[in-house]
Amino acid sequence: MAMTEESVDQVEVNCLCVQHGQSCNNTRCFVKEGLRANWFYNPVLEEFAIPDSYQEGHGVNVKITFSHRSRNLRHNGHDVICSYSHLGSHISIRCTCNKPRPHLSLIEAACSMYNLD
């Protein structure tokens, strides 16, 4: 089985994720929970060659396969156990700036989206 090398951009995304994970104060952090941000780059195409669903830009995708959380909460004087299961989702952060390179704002935006309930 052949091994494939990660692109330089993916290595940079991995480094940015480590940097983010060390300073993130969010309640939940996809980096701290062991999820991976995958780099993508969709260059500008010639006008006549653009497929209908094509979106130019660069960014990261984070795949969330399954999550389950339980919390003990107190509501109106009652102790309750709250559970939440999520079967999976996909976070996609796409930037259209003129410098198609990994940048920390992509990772921070992915973490913000990960924290939306």
From Swiss-Prot:
Keywords: Early protein
Taxonomy, superkingdom: Viruses
Name the record gives this protein: Early E3 13.3 kDa protein
